[in-house]
Amino acid sequence: MEKVLKKIILASKSIDRTELFNRIDIPFEVQASNIDEEKFKKRISDPILLVKELANAKLLYVKGELIKKNSQALIIAADTIVELNGIIIGKAKNPEGASKILKNLMGKAHNLITGIAISNTDDPKIIIDHAITSVEFLTLSDSEIDNYVKTNEWKGRAGAYSINDKASLFISKINGSSSNVIGLPMHKIYEILKNDFGLNLFHM
């Protein structure tokens, strides 16, 4: 039997993830976590394990805050990284860093890896999963990369680009979930909610 859910909490301050939820027109609220991501990145080198651990940590933080308030909700947390030849590529801190990352990715296939963690506030069960999408770029000139960096789309984004915006002009191939490149593998979330929590997003 399908269950009725009063509230979904997206444990992320990412505008791209918020936009993904807005597109499917279901009620949700955003509550960002406050964890030290660098602590995890220093001790975990495996990209899949890293995104899973970060997603779980974000979920536990928000879940704890909601439980303190006796708030009933289902929480969805996520973390996305870019991986190229086994090396984790994070978010650029400045335009120079963004340019360096993009030059490294040009003409190559790289992986977008997203870890997700989902749980109810009234249930200790936590479902953790991940998705991998391969993305390939065209080869751009230095001036084209400089022009893209000036758009500031790189800010706060893994791999220093956003598929939703002008970066779509130089993405030549995607193998896997396109929504995962944005920040959430929506097919995974749909399946987990349906199979593990008895929820159907078509009936929200």
What is each of the regions a protein language model found here?
Residues M1-L74, I87, L140-S143, T151, ...:
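N-terminal polybasic phosphate/anion-binding patch
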Residues R17, Q72, I81-L84, I89, ...:
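Short, active-site-adjacent cap segments at secondary-structure transitions
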Residues F21, A55, D79, A98, ...:
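Residue-level signal for inorganic ion chemistry
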Residues I35, F40, I89, Y161-I163, ...:
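Short clusters of hydrophobic/aromatic residues that line enzyme substrate/ligand-binding pockets
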Residues L50, T80-H110, T139:
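Active-site-adjacent loop/tail segments of enzyme domains
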Residues T80-V82, L112-S119, Y161:
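Short beta-strand scaffold segments in enzyme catalytic cores
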Residues I101-L102, G115-S119, D123-I127:
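Anionic-ligand binding region
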Residues I126-H203:
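Active-site oxyanion/phosphate-handling segment shared across diverse enzymes
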